[in-house]
Amino acid sequence: MKKMELLAPAGNPEKLKLAFLYGADAAYLGGTSFSLRAFSDNFTPEQIKEAVEYAHSLGKKIYVTVNIFPSDEDFQYLPDYLRYLESIDVDAVLIADPGIFRLCREVAPNLSIHVSTQANTTNWSAVRFWKECGAERVVLAREVPLRDVKDIYEKTHMELEGFVHGAMCISYSGRCLLSNYFTQDRDSNHGECVQCCRFKYSLVEEKRPGEYFPVMEDERGTYIMNSKDMCLIGHFQA
């Protein structure tokens, strides 16, 4: 049986070392730009290079997130950044936006691409599409049921990655506008979500002003907003 890769996030160099110390085979991290890991300390270009060298000395891997949904102005700086990541032998980049994917293939053709969970890949046909585009791995959307993962693999024979711990967004993998609405400048699609779905809410119907329906939660979660944490550790053997 093929060995599964254990991948952990690294918000800064110290956490990177801890991830490897406790058994991670690879770590993913964000740079100071173009990453949805906005509230991590993140890594400067030089720190990314040092992280790659450190990981490779241990026989481990580094993946860098380049998974924002960019505006046109971002494309002024992305080519040089992607070329730099290729030059320092980053093991792969995580990309969600087709425009960045296309650019990466053009300016850094030797850089492996993993399709980020932010791309909301939920089915075998989409996985096959990314495979045909040249992706080496697809990180499935968190909404994909565990029972579907085997079927997706059998129909694509694509390298797949899935989250086994962490928050479940109420929207498809971060496509939420609540954070923008309530804060005006904290964009969930740029890694700045304040998780407004975890606030306490009441529901009001327009024709019944002053009558508040509390958004309650039971063992199955809430029925209006359903943010929860996932935990699949019971499905894995040591």
Question: What spans do the regions from the language model cover?
Answer:
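Active-site loop and adjoining helix of the penicillin-binding protein/serine DD-peptidase-beta-lactamase fold
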Residues: E143
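Active-site pocket-lining/capping segments in soluble small-molecule metabolic enzymes
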Residues: M1-T121, D148-A238
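Conserved nucleotide-cofactor-binding alpha/beta core module
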Residues: W124-S125
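Acidic, glycine-enriched active-site microenvironments
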Residues: S112, G134, V138-L140
